[in-house]
Amino acid sequence: MTRLPTRFTFLLAVCVFLSACGKTPEEQLLQATGSQALLPLHEKFLAESLNLAQSTSAFCAQRSRSSTDLAALRNRWVGAMNGWEGIQSIQFGPVIEDNQSWKVQFWPDRKNLIARKTEQFVKGDEAITLPALQEASVVIQGLSAMEYLLYDKPAEKLLSDEGQPYCDHLSTAATNLHQVADFLYQRWHPKGGNYLGTWQSPGPDNLAYPDKNAAIGALIETLVYGLERIKRDKLERPLGLSNAGQANPFLLEWWRSKQSREAILINLHSLQLLYSAGDGAGLEELLRHRDKEELSQKVTALFDRAISATASIEGSLSENHREAANRSAINTLHQTLGELLAAFKREIPATLGITLGFNANDGD
């Protein structure tokens, strides 16, 4: 029997394991980004939403609730919020169907609709049920309404006898959130709706992605959208970094729970994951394949700088954004986001021969 050389056997095993041999760099990008970034990020949101739904149900079933119980439930909410922030920037696939993102988060809330509509729903004549919630405004259906219930005036009522209607809303919203997370995950999963397969298999018979550039372009547009949203909506407008210069901390994301900085940090980590595909052959590797090692390294360094600047911000953005040290970090973050946007809007598409859609260039 002929024995294969050890080196060849090893390489063959690697090829079978990675299912990458024979694939073009673009195909490898789609495979790696899907399996190592898109699907795991949705799976994390699903898991965290389930933890929150189960914990909320247990919390509201208690005859008496303590501040310790409330603190533990808040931690579960933070976990679900973190899971959502991981996929918040994605602008293709199931999340854009039927206002799924609005069902999870209503923000920015310029008119305090979350508080007003939540109070109306809780104090209304209709029983607080899942169908009633799902037929009501998206403002009160997801994480944003839950944040109000857990961190604003209703939080005290949750610990008293009069708090049951608020707890009913809290528990129902958590169940609804889990249903949305499950819908998103199942629609992506190969054994469900398999949108992952749709994105990973561009071609003339694929109406959504007729060629590889269309599929990769959707990924780049997501990166542009996510970076632009951090820069404009999470920094410039609430902190007065735009031309007007007037800060309004109530426009910050998650200002009630003081999770604004943490949300940005998770955004950046997930966007970097979408760029690199972790250890896989992501967009970062494709640039190297196109002899753009310098550009690839520059973008990686910019992500690292943005993450470092965000992590160095002390305290909450709503209360401490004017402190000198924090202002310096915020300015560094703001500048770095601008450099990242320039790379993803112009340099990378030009290198890959990809034309981005109108929305990805909005704000130029």
Map each language-model feature to its residues.
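C-terminal motif of bacterial Sec signal peptides marking the signal peptidase cleavage site
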Residues: 18-20
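Bacterial N-terminal signal peptides that target proteins for export
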Residues: 1-10
